[in-house]
Every structure is written in C-alpha cells, then in structure tokens.
Amino acid sequence: VRMLVPEDVELRFTDLIRGEVNAPHPDDQVILKADGFPTYHLAVVVDDHEMGITHVVRGEEWISSTPKHLLLYRMLGLTPPAFAHMPLLRNEDKSKISKRKNPAARLTWFQQEGYLPEALVNFLALLAYPPMTETDGSDREVFTFGEFSDRFDWSKVNPVGPIFDMKKLQWLNGVYIRELEVGDFTARLLPFLEDAGVLSGAPSLGELG
C-alpha cells in the first residue's frame, strides 16, 4: 500500500527551531508492505499519536521525512505534534560525529571517564543554546538543568551544527567537581578507586548504576 501524495499539496511546515521550512515533494511512499507489516513512516505516526506525543525533537536529517508524516496525520484525521529539528553535532574538524567511531557518542563513555552528569547536561545545553543572560546583561555558562528549563525558548536554539568541544566539557566538569561537598565527592570517587584496584570493598560503577 502506498501513500498517494497529491501534486498540489502544501508541503511547508513550521519548525520550532528553523521557522517556515519548504520541503521537497515526497514520492508515493510505501506505508504497508505486501506481508501487511507497516513501514517506519506509518508506524511512527501511529505510535506517536497513541502515546500522546506533543513534540517530536530529532536530528535535522529527518527534515525531508516530516512532510510525509504530516500528510499521514492529515489523512488519518489525527492532530500532528510540533516538530523541532536539532542541528547535528560536529567534531572539531567539522566532520559529522560517528556513533560507531567516536567513543564520546556513547553516554557510558562519559561515566567511565569521570564526567559528572551535571557537567554533561550543562555542556550539551551550551552546544546549541546561548549562555544564560543575567539581569546586568552579562553571560553565565554554568547553570543547572532547572535554570535552563525555566528559561528555555525554542527560538534561541542555534540551527547551525555546533562543534563538540571537549576542552569546554573538561572545564565545566572541573567547575562542578570543585563545587562538590566532601562527602558527595568521596562517594563519587570510590567506584573509580575500586575499579583501579586501589581500594577493595567499594561499590563498582556498575553497582551504582
């Protein structure tokens, strides 16, 4: 079964980050295979509707698929969610970050290397979003997730692919480590000492989740 796309259909849509987007005319996409199994495009639309998804936030490589999904919502008589297409992260040489080749593309790598979750969240926020602006007009790069979410504005997200600057992450991590209370710092340090064989009896990183 194919989705018949009318030649005169309106294919522009509003992206929360990029504003009005003019997408290329899609082909008559297969939405149901011969064996009755739905393809991704039909499955994701129905699944998002059934789960009550209000915002679809995904990488910019999916922009060309959005008109297909919006047409399916319309044909099925469903209310579409809002769409936001994030810029793709880049290495320092501006090449695309590979999930297979770059260890930093895996969250577990940051845990194993000793990066604090608070520092990583702060760093990721800064990749596509400007620093916090204080009442005196100054910028502040160190902020909590609560502060970030309270001030978040889609219109401020940078649509240009940001550079994954490890030096900035290392600096932020140092800031957060120095702010830890002694007890908290010790609790976070013990698993690394255990894994290194320096101490015995301390919980491992895996046991701490």
Which residues does each PLM region occupy?
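Catalytic adenosine-cofactor/nucleotide-binding cores of aminoacyl-tRNA synthetases and other
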Residues: L78-G209
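Active-site cores that bind ATP or allylic diphosphates and position pyrophosphate for catalysis
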Residues: V1-K99, R106
